[in-house]
Amino acid sequence: PWRKKRLARQGMASGGLREAALLFFVMFCAGLAALTVFPAYFWTAYHWQEALAGHEVFFPLTPLSESIQEIQWTPTVLQNLREGGWGGYMAIANLLIFCPVGFFSALLWRGNRCMRGLLTGFCTSFCVEFLQLFVGRATDIDDLILNTLGGCLGGLLCLIFAHLAPRF
């Protein structure tokens, strides 16, 4: 009700399906943050038991100088796709995980849908990669490239969807 009133004051409206899409996008972003920004072991029961007992740091931070030395600056996307295996799987996963970011940003905020998806994918991926520097997660240029392309692909899918369901 609050959002509906606020939109009405601005002379705008949003249907139930659009609001459901917004809710799904928020839930997806929360899941994406849980998957990418927190340390890999953060969600384990052992970590919580040890942290709550005071035997382990709740949210350990990695020194920036240490993280910067481990960044993979050379793109290996094509090589990973050619060779397949784990690298190929991760390349495809990085592309697909950001399709919803591009799709929902293009769906929810009007304008050039592909460009909106590309920019949102890039900015979100850049923020994730930057935050990963501080929590001991791997950061590399491939993630930024593939996540950005995934956002663009999501924007393109939204463009197709908009032609199929123009009133959504």
Language-model regions, residue ranges each:
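Bulky hydrophobic segments
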Residues: 1-136, 156-168
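Alpha-helical transmembrane segments that form the membrane-embedded catalytic/substrate-binding core
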Residues: 139-161
